[in-house]
Amino acid sequence: MGKRLHLFVLLFVGFAVQAQIFPGNPKRVLFIGNSITYAGRYVQIIEAYQRAKFPSQEIDIYNVGLPSETVSGLSEDGHASGRFPRPDLHERLARVLEQIKPDLVFATYGMNDGIYLPLDETRFQKFKDGILWMHEQVHASGAKIIHITPSLYEEKPNENIGYGKVLDEYSHWLTQQKNWQVIDTHSALQKYLNAELKKNANFRISKDGVHPGDEGHWMMAKEILRYLGAKKINRMNSVEEMLEPFKDPKAYFDLIVQRHNMLKDSWLTKIGHKRPEMKMGLPMQEANLKAEQWMKQIKEFTR
């Protein structure tokens, strides 16, 4: 056994009897959410881990995150400079579930659902109602669902909306739901932010206060993988370190990203949505052919 392959085996020791990182051995795993999920880096990291650790496992991972979307159905006046209201998950969820037919769904909403206003019980109830509806719809389709708490809102200097507190409340409510699987990335990001602020008072996870950068997506992926049982992930500080046993971890991850992004846009286009100004994806037949070609290259890394 080559030195790198030997290291690869040792890196993931303890999971030999597990067929994949996802519970219940699903064949079709769906990630749904807003622009943070559409950006997709945290999903891509999870996919890279799954495919690196279990190269023989045939599993499809879908990302149909949609920028601006809410599960509350709310939209602020003048959203997107008045060009369009926020899309509502209620409009497309049935099509998503029907066309993808997932076995397992990861869902993360909340960032847009309070429409960037102070905490208000009416808006909060709309969020709760939307989450409960989504939970029921996913279960009715025969799939399992794992909720992910919203990421952080970092207020700008001299801003005093208190929207960070809104997301604290939304996240806390989610974690208190009985018999639900909930991954608390919100608290993990807050802990990380607090630690970094002690070193650098100007540190930010997101430049605009909403959309995490690569480091934020890495922390989200780490918390999700840790929840799913990847205990060794806590010791790792980057995607490259996670994939270090490969000869060229960057090339491997780049292939995952290219394939993921192409399929993401194709599925969004095929399923349909009410969000203007989105990239048109390739027709699914063409996208699937390209995806197969990329998958062959990805699998070469684990032979």
What are these regions (language model features)?
Residues Q18-S68, S72-S75, R83, L93-K101, ...:
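Serine-esterase "nucleophile elbow" of acetyl-processing enzymes
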Residues S35-Y38, L66-S72, L104, M111-Y116, ...:
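Solvent-exposed loop/turn segments at secondary-structure junctions
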